[in-house]
Amino acid sequence: MRALIVDDSSFVREYLRHLLDRMGIACEEAVDGSDALAVLTDEKEFDLMLLDVNMPVMNGLECVKALREAKMHPEMKVMMVTTEADNSFITRALDNGADEFLMKPFTPESLREKMMLLGFAA
């Protein structure tokens, strides 16, 4: 299994990589939505993208919308990593193509639970 971690915070990227490495998941990283789309056009296959919402250049909502509109990696699951939990945001993210949410701050257990909801054994 392969995951793409997209977050402008190096701390969050390193923490997610550490947790996913412990689950046996290979990871690559991107610093914003634009960088993520560039990685995804390199013909690499990913099963999961963990996508921060608030980033410079291209935010997570713009990225997931562009990804789904371009029909890039249609089988890849997108988990939004966010501090925003209001219903209007969740509706907007789901409408743009997100599959699940991981609320910051998160624990290893909450990440595992969300992975299982997406159908990944964690």
Where are these regions (language model features)?
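Acidic, metal-coordinating helix/loop segments flanking the phosphotransfer/catalytic sites
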Residues: 29-48
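C-terminal output helix
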Residues: 106-115
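Charged docking surfaces used in two-component/phosphorelay signaling
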Residues: 14-22
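Receiver (REC) domain active-site loop signature in two-component systems and cognate sites
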Residues: 55-58
